[in-house]
């Protein structure tokens, strides 16, 4: 259910600045193919890993591959800080820009403050207050330590679902690519509607009625 790299090529225009690829349900996108498209067209690759904290692509954790990777810390995700999210990058220039962007566009350059005084700062561009509080951070860090166990539990549940659904021809369970490990934020089944007498909404309501 992730984006097709070939479809990305069809959408590129001279105005394109970046590619934002979503790791839907926790399954990493094809980072090799999409990364090559970004590199060939001088574009920034932003990986939306809101669903994919802890997922891996070719034995590398998501967050260590794209130019920037975003994660959600909403209460329904793998770990939470109450609300909000975070962005990671290995690019020092992007990191500097992100720090300004989260703090009202303010630059607190260390060397400049040494020369002109600790009160010195410049508001260099439009920015916002996206700073995570220490209380929120502590909550997230404490849960981050539990992430491996949380991921393992999700994978055990996926195995049970796959076994339970294996002989039901009316649906197709989600697949995991051979070179990736999904974080299984969601377990999305595909209904084979041609073999069913009910549509998706009716099945959804019936499942909800059974809790």
What are the language-model segments listed below?
Residues 3-6, 10, 18-22, 27, ...:
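PLP-dependent aminotransferase class I/II
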Residues 9-11, 37, 61-65:
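Short, hinge-like loop/turn segments at secondary-structure boundaries
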Residues 17-18, 44, 68:
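Short, Asp-centered acidic motifs that coordinate Mg2+ and/or phosphate
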Residues 22, 46-47:
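Hydrophobic residues in beta-strands of the RecA-like P-loop NTPase core, especially within AAA+ ATPase
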Residues 47-80, 110, 119-124:
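Conserved active-site segment immediately N-terminal to the catalytic lysine
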Residues 64-108, 134:
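Active-site PLP attachment segment
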């Amino acid at each position: 259910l992730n984006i097709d790299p070939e479809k990305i090529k069809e959408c590129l225009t001279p105005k394109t600045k970046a590619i934002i690829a979503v790791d839907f349900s926790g399954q990493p996108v094809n980072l090799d193919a999409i990364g090559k498209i970004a590199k060939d067209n001088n574009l920034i690759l932003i990986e939306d890993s809101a669903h994919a904290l802890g997922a891996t692509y070719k034995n590398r954790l998501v967050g260590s591959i794209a130019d920037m990777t975003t994660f959600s810390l909403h209460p329904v995700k793998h770990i939470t800080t109450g609300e909000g999210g975070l962005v990671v990058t290995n690019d020092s220039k992007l990191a500097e820009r992100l720090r300004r962007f989260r703090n009202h566009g303010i630059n607190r350059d260390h060397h400049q403050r040494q020369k002109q005084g600790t009160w010195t700062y410049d508001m260099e561009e439009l920015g916002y207050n996206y700073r995570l509080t220490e209380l929120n951070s502590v909550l997230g860090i404490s849960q981050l330590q539990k992430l491996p166990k949380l991921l393992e539990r999700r994978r055990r549940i996926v195995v049970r679902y796959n076994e339970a659904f294996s002989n039901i021809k009316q649906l197709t369970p989600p697949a995991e690519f051979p070179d990736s490990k999904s974080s299984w934020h969601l377990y999305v089944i595909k209904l084979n509607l041609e073999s069913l007498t009910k549509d998706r909404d009716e099945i959804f309501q019936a499942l909800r009625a059974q809790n």
